[in-house]
Structure formats: C-alpha cells, structure tokens
Curated annotation (Swiss-Prot):
The lineage of its organism: Bacteria, Bacillati, Mycoplasmatota, Mycoplasmoidales, Mycoplasmoidaceae. This is Thymidine kinase. Zn(2+) binds at residues 150, 153, 185, 188. It comes from Mycoplasma genitalium (strain ATCC 33530 / DSM 19775 / NCTC 10195 / G37) (Mycoplasmoides genitalium). InterPro entries: P-loop_NTPase, Thymidine_kinase, Thymidine_kinase_CS. Transmembrane segments: none annotated. GO terms for cellular component: cytosol. GO terms for biological process: DNA biosynthetic process; thymidine metabolic process. Its main location: cytoplasm. It is an enzyme of class 2 (transferase). Its EC number is 2.7.1.21.
Length: 213
C-alpha cells in the first residue's frame, strides 16, 4: 500500500494513517509530510487531543521538529474550525485518544473532498488494538505501519512496553514518554497478566512445545 500516492485531483478526499508503537517516528513522519505539502502551497491544519498534555498547542517529534496545532476535546470540534476555511488537508496526531466519533468526522471530511492524514498507536501496552485506530485503518486509502527498535535486543519492535502500572486493571491511558514506556519486539514484550486462551489453543501449544523439548 505504501507505493500508492494519494491524488489532490479527486472529488472525494483520501485518508492516510501512520501507525506503529511508541518511538517509531510516527509524528516525525507526519510532520515531514506536512512540511513538504506546505512548501508546495497546500493548505494544512493540524489537530491534537486535549488529553495529550506533553506539549501545548503544538505537535512535536522527538527529533525536535514541531508545528502549530489546535487542541480539541471532541472530534466534532474539527467541524468548527473548517466551516469558514478551506483546508486541503486535515492532520490529526495521537488519534488513538479520540472516541469513535473520529470515524464519522473523517468519513464526512472525505465525502466533501477534504484529505485527512492521521498518526497514532495501533496497539496499546497490552498489545491489543487501541481505541479508534483499527476502524481508521479499515477506511484508510493508505497505511504506513512503522517499526521502532527493541530496547532489549535491538531488533525491530512492533509493541509498546509500559514500565509502570502494567497490569490488566491499570488505566489504559497513561500519558508519558521514555520514563514510562519502551519499544519492544514480540519476544521481549512483557505483560504481567496473561491473556485468556481456549483449551484447544492451550493443548495445541503444549503439544508443539513438547515436540521441541
């Protein structure tokens, strides 16, 4: 899907999603694209959720790049900022923190010809689908799935390791950075509460593991 290049000449807008674990460069890639569009005189507006308190009214990558953003609580607030202005692209950072209302908003924007680019975590610290992102991936025209580097072994990492409050009953959302999270590969991702599996799956794994011992 990465070879597909969205066109600005279509009557319907397109949606692109940039996803991956923490420390995979999602915001960096988002800002890089926005910078290129602005050089080409393409109008872009950026939104971010109010729950992300790490930066105020800006979207900032870990390499220091940043751009101005509008902080909103509800996805429907995006409409208020577009009524009197004709932006060609709406950019949304940290989209996993928005409710499923974001699906309706993105679909509506595409219907009226507005293009949307989104960045967000596709899985949470439990390695399970995160919030609205799976549905956004389903309706996206382009998906950029990024990898990070595992803090333990240096291999490609697809998961986010929470270093504190990492039990099932702990809050799903914990705003933080390197002090609270690391990127991990599947082998080194640790989650304290084991996921429930069926008896058939348990028996199958025991049989396979028994052959390798």
């Amino acid at each position: 899907m990465g070879k597909y290049q969205p066109s600005f000449q279509t009557k319907k807008g397109w949606t692109e999603v940039i996803c991956g674990p923490m420390f995979s460069g999602k915001t960096e890639k988002l800002l890089h694209k926005i910078k290129r569009w602005k050089i080409a005189k393409i109008s872009v507006v950026i939104f971010k959720p109010i729950i992300d308190t790490r930066q105020t009214n800006i979207v900032k990558s870990r390499n220091g790049e940043y751009d101005q953003a509008i902080t909103i609580n509800s996805p429907f607030e995006i409409y208020d900022h577009l009524v009197d202005k004709n932006y060609q692209i709406v950019a949304i950072d940290e989209a996993q923190f928005f409710s499923n209302e974001i699906i309706e908003v993105v679909t509506t924007l595409n219907e009226i010809g507005t293009n949307v680019i989104i960045s967000g975590l596709d899985t949470d610290f439990r390695a399970e689908p995160f919030g609205c992102i799976p549905q956004l991936l389903a309706i996206a025209d382009v998906v950029n799935k990024l990898d990070a580097i595992c803090n333990v072994c240096g291999s490609l990492a697809q998961r986010t390791q929470r270093l504190v409050n990492k039990n099932t009953n702990d809050n799903l959302v914990l705003i933080g950075d390197a002090e609270a999270y690391e990127a991990r590969c599947k082998l080194h991702h640790s989650f304290l509460t084991k996921k429930h599996v069926t008896v058939k799956t348990k028996n199958f794994k025991e049989q396979v593991q028994g052959k390798t011992q």
